[in-house]
């Protein structure tokens, strides 16, 4: 694989990617068969031999100078707006994305180029109709990843709901985050997320898209971009998903690409958890029980048998502040333990209370909503 493409080859590769009725995989196979995109557009003898064998609607486009002219305009616009095209046949193309069934031939990147090989990419996705439980859970998942695997990069789609919560949580914890968009990088959808999107760029993250500048969002593009979210990531975590949530397509793409999928459980009565429960029931996703459990499943670091689930958590004993000592708390086994012990991890609360992890997480969620406890770094909880 060439370390880089010549400027001419870059232009003609973009031109080929613009050709209608030629999908990314077909375009890549065509380049590999002919040796270069440049030859397809400039070698008269090759064109005379190849074009008649292609469908007429494709051959007419390749015979016209229109595609190359448009490619030159796109390159000029990319340079003007700080957008970097990355090509499938270049060594700087993200290796995990190269392995999916239909990788983009050109990936457009805006912002700091994230070192894919040096970080652990995890996609955090879910419903747009996020519940209060989903908000708390998204923040907790990202917080656990930050504490347990500081080399994490959070990948999501900048959509309403779980996506934007995941990006914002990553930014608050100084984790790089990558937004995969369903349109050209000269604009932003939804526009309500401009502030967070710009902070992603300022804080060393990136926007990525398979669409060149000038392409507006359209329905099919949102499903297509989900394969890129999954393809960039070693694992996908589904926070909340209704029965027909678009985030389930991200999980499907991840599974098709041989990646691991983790689904977070919710209450049985919550419609926004039906999709997650089905993934777990059908054994298409691991039950998400925490970042350390996920890391072991991924082989990112096996803990010793006697080690705690959160090796990077804060000290297990932290005396509550004086205001907590004078506050009157309702009777609850978890509150009683926190009053006596101070800040504890979820695993410690489970061990000391005798409750299973799922019950502890559910109870902590209710207590957090009621203002009795607050989540801390490393998956720990303390009294408010």
What are these regions (language model features)?
Residues 1-91, 370-372, 377-384:
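Short, small/acidic-rich helices and loops at N termini and domain boundaries
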